[in-house]
Amino acid sequence: FIICANNLGSCYGTTGPLSINPETGKAWFSDFPTITIRDMANALELLKKELKIEKIHTVIGSSQGGQIAQEWAIMFPGNTNNLILIATNCVHSSWGIAFNESQRMAIKADPSYGENTDEGGAAGLQVARSIALLSYRNYATYDVSQRERRKKTGYKAAADYQQYQGEKLVKRVNAYSYVRLSEAMDSHDVCRNRCKNHEAGLHKIKANTLVIGVTSDILFPIEEQQRIADSIPKANFATIDSLYGHDAFLIETEQ
């Protein structure tokens, strides 16, 4: 059977900022504790034990999910037979952290973020989504995907697309979860407080591993996946050749 679990801090059912703080009887909102990728991996291990699963056939993780999958495999070696890591890294880059901080700045610049309501920070979250899209795609992606729209609607096609994506996200994600999840991504470092270098951290992974990178990914450059594959003892490396950047793993399903 297949299990797709919500991550700690998310807004899809697992404990997160809209959950009730037992000490106050009210939702956490911006007071929700800072969490790390390792916290998320520990939460998945608790779920595994609750479901009485002794061994996992395959763990699949992409982007932040790939970060969690690595930590899970390092913290609990022998947990899974196989590991598939897609468009991810072993330590979150300064480039990625800068993108995440820019998004958080946009959210916190929205005065409603400090009001601690379900809709708090919604306008800022729309801007954050627009910033994020620029890192998920690239110049060629926009040039190709907006070409036909631009012929029909004029030069505002790309601008309208950014607005649309921002409006769509706020219908399913709250700003407080977005902030905490992005902070967790920034914390990712398989070497932190456990080894001298990242290669040594990755060497602890015992599972058969397939690492997949996207040729045009500017957020998680393909060199980051190659580094992972080179450092895990039983790893193979593959690529998705696409102009869709980081989002290619969601789009290029045939590959």
Residue ranges with predicted function:
Residues 218-224:
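Conserved alpha/beta-hydrolase "acid-adjacent" motif
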Residues 238, 243-254:
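Catalytic histidine-centered segment of alpha/beta-hydrolase-like enzymes
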Residues 1-67, 74, 78-91, 95-99, ...:
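Gly/Pro-rich cap/lid or specificity-loop segments adjacent to the active site
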Residues 205, 211-213, 217:
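Short beta-strand/loop motif that positions the catalytic acidic residue
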